[in-house]
UniProtKB/Swiss-Prot annotation:
HAMAP family from the UniProt entry: eIF3b (MF_03001)
Protein known as: Eukaryotic translation initiation factor 3 subunit B
Subunit structure: Component of the eukaryotic translation initiation factor 3 (eIF-3) complex.
Compartments reported by the entry: Cytoplasm
Length: 739
């Protein structure tokens, strides 16, 4: 009879434990009793400090810890040793286990200062993996996945015919095509529902971005495979940095995290804007939107008017080392990249600031040796203080030039593409505030002291202004005052300006070349290579003219324009019904005019023109929405190599003409070959059918089918004359009186 529990001896108990080994069952079915330890993390790598410095260290550490979750000072335990010094680690309790996971994911390996780097682990992980036997003592080399070659993200640049690509969005489809000049475009890829809002190329053409309710997706390579994903719920706006290193996304809805953090952490919760690192695919920092002041409503009530979105919310310096945003009326915050820390830990306070713009290129000012980035800004009249335009050097934050302005209604800042000039377009009102006029204040940034030239010969308001890319000429459009309630669009004037020639070769003062009156134009579109400009009337219901201008015409120059650096010539005027957009290809050889269904639904599609205005093709596309050319990165040729190409351009032109002729011959040959193939197929089919008919006749016992011989012409038939007589017969005649 087995002994009862009460009669068991101490020895029996020990024998039972020794005889039966439960270790394998415990390892397989062990129940974790962590009792809330999932919300704890252990932070190692902290500085060793005395007891009196511990509260200060905890407060400093708390700022880091709260970027990924929520914790408190009393939830941080930092043990001390016998000497009253900290041990270099701490235990931290977060509000939820998800926040603890986010801390290990985002804070592990981040620097606390120059000498200390944080190591963050979950307390349960330390307990789980720190036990004896949980980690193999023998090293097992990791399995290395076989190398997989990635797609060449700039493969389109190697096209043997140097063709350009464009993306076209129509209906629910997005396609990428090769431009084939006057032939139908050649499709590269075409996909349904590729985007929900729009598509956009990155500035150097490496990526094609699509926008979805879940976020932004980047595509690239010969077959446009997925490259990067940037989750941002309900994103509606995006912008790349100039060198494609960073991406900004914006949504009107603040981010809400429903489940455990993924790519987005608790730091992004409640924010509208995220700045991403494209290489890593991770967010650098997130922000809440600053809404611009709402325009006044019909009754002067600004509170009832719809608030305007400030976009781009962040503006990038040319070298991508800084990004800045404006708090309207108060300050400009400048952040250093890639750490996204505030420059000098403080924003630049500028009372009343209304707008700012970075120089699009790094500028070398005369007498300045250190590297700098420039930004321009303006403030309105405040009390008795005049309006002001300023030029600031970054990172020093030194204001290197200011200019006072009076009777100002509005200001627009226009940088030349190389940063050599910044044109300040000033709309001034009369003392009675009943009329407006515009004058231009042009800052010559590269010259000593940054002199300012004033162009005050304009009598009307400037509604559009554009610098020549990599040049020193500009075009503007002016209009007079429009009576209220008038449905007819106002007449405009197009003015071309160029600098005077000087003996030193430097650009002289800006002078008017010519003004074209009684136009309806409202858009200016320079060729990316300069010299040629398209001036068009877009988004109009009555006028659709597109003018192609050449500012370096090689013909005879008018006597009154001899001293100016321009020879203006209208090459051609076209019309495109319902035109809404004008886009140059990156080489400056072709121009696309398009009519988008986003604006109207009449005759949607696009036309392709040469730079001189010759229309190559016209494509009517149902539900056409968008056409965007793929940008090209800057050339790798040196300036000397580029000069050599220009010198030998005539020789290259002959080669290109021969290639074009050969391409046409190939196309014609292909047509002939196709027709020959069809004829041969028809002949073979006819022969086969005849053989089948003969076999059937033979089976049925019918005589062989003989084709009737062709009728032979009778002798003398060549001299015969055929006379035809047409006889008309009236069957019925009726007369009807029409009122």
């Amino acid at each position: 009879m087995a002994p009862s529990f009460d009669t068991l001896s101490e020895q029996d108990l020990h024998e039972e434990e020794v005889e039966i080994d439960f270790s394998d069952l415990k390892a397989q079915y062990e129940v974790r009793l962590e009792e809330g330890l999932d919300a704890f993390v252990v932070i190692d790598g902290l500085p060793v400090v005395p007891e009196e410095s511990k509260p200060k260290l905890i407060k400093f550490l708390l700022k880091k810890l709260n970027t990924v979750g929520r914790t408190r000072e009393d939830a941080i335990f930092m043990p001390l040793n016998e000497k009253g010094m900290s041990e270099g680690f701490a235990f931290v309790e977060y509000d939820t286990p998800e926040q603890a996971i986010a801390a290990t994911k985002h804070l592990h390996g981040t620097p606390l200062d120059k000498k200390h780097t944080l190591a963050v682990n979950k307390l349960t992980d330390i307990d789980r993996y720190g036990r004896e036997g949980r980690v193999d003592e023998e090293y097992t080399p990791p399995k290395i996945e076989p190398f997989q070659e990635k797609e060449h993200l700039r493969s389109w640049l190697g096209d043997p015919n140097a063709r350009d690509q464009f993306a076209m969005y129509r209906g629910d489809k997005v396609g990428v095509f090769w431009n084939m000049k006057n032939n139908p475009p050649e499709n590269v890829v075409d996909r349904d529902h590729w985007t929900q809002l729009f598509v956009q190329w990155s500035p150097l053409g490496t990526y094609l971005a699509s926008v979805h309710p879940q976020g932004v997706q980047l595509w690239g390579g010969p077959q446009f495979g997925k490259q990067k994903q940037f989750p941002h719920p309900f994103v509606s706006l995006m912008e790349f940095s100039p060198g494609e290193k960073y991406l900004t996304t914006w949504s009107s809805r603040p981010i809400q995290l429903d489940g455990p953090p993924g790519a987005l952490s608790y730091e992004e919760e409640g924010k509208n804007i995220i700045i991403w690192d494209i290489t890593t695919g991770k967010p650098l920092r997130s922000f809440v939107s600053h809404e611009l002041a709402a325009p006044a409503g019909p009754d002067g009530d600004a509170a009832q008017a719809k608030k305007k979105v400030q976009w781009p919310a962040f503006k990038w310096s040319a070298d991508e080392k800084f990004v800045a945003r404006m708090l309207p009326g108060q300050s400009i915050s400048i952040y250093e990249l890639p750490r996204m820390n505030l420059l000098d830990r403080t924003s630049v306070k500028i009372e009343g600031v209304m707008d700012f713009e970075w120089s699009p290129a790094t500028v070398q000012r005369e007498g300045v040796k250190q590297s700098e980035q420039l930004l321009s800004f303006w403030t309105p009249e405040i009390g008795s203080n005049p309006a002001k335009v300023g030029l600031m050097s970054i990172p020093s934050k030194e204001v290197v030039r200011t200019r006072n302005l009076f009777n100002v209604s509005d200001v627009k800042l226009h940088w030349q593409s190389q940063g050599a000039y910044v044109c300040v377009k000033v709309d001034r009102h009369s003392k009675s505030k009943k009329s407006l006029a515009t004058n231009l204040e042009i800052f010559r940034v590269r010259e000593k002291g940054v002199p300012v030239e004033v162009v005050d010969s304009l009598k009307d308001t400037v509604i559009n202004f554009a610098w020549e890319p990599k040049g020193n000429r500009f075009v503007l459009i002016t209009t007079g005052e429009v009576p209220t309630g008038t449905a007819v669009p106002p007449k405009t004037a197009v003015s071309f300006f160029a600098p005077e020639k000087t003996k030193s070769g430097a650009a002289g003062n800006f002078k008017l070349v010519r003004t074209i009156e009684k136009k309806t134009s409202n858009g200016i579109y320079w060729s990316p290579k300069g010299r040629f400009v398209v001036v068009a009337t877009v988004h109009s219901q009555q006028h659709f003219d597109i003018d192609f201008w050449d500012l370096d015409f090689e013909g005879e120059k008018p006597e009154n324009e001899k001293d100016l650096s321009a020879n203006l010539q209208l090459m051609k005027t076209n019309e495109h019904f319902g035109v809404t957009d004008i886009d140059w290809d990156p080489t400056g050889r072709y121009v696309v005019s398009s009519a988008s269904a986003w604006t109207h639904s009449l005759e949607n599609g696009y036309h392709i023109h040469t730079f001189s205005g010759t229309t190559l093709t016209e494509h009517a596309v149902e539900k056409f929405k968008q056409l965007v050319w793929r940008p090209r990165p800057p050339t790798l040729l040196s300036k000397e190599e580029q000069k050599k190409v220009r010198r030998n351009l005539r020789e290259y032109s002959r080669e290109f003409d021969e290639e074009d002729k050969y391409a046409v011959d190939i196309a014609n040959t292909a047509i002939v070959e196709m027709r020959k193939r069809l004829l041969n197929e028809w002949t073979a089919w006819l022969k086969k059918e005849k053989e089948m008919v003969e076999e059937e006749r033979e089976v049925l016992g019918l005589p062989k089918y003989e084709e009737e011989p062709a009728a032979k012409p009778t002798p003398g038939a060549e001299d015969d004359t055929i006379v035809e007589e047409i006889v008309e017969e009236i069957i019925e005649e009726s007369e009807e009186i029409v009122a």
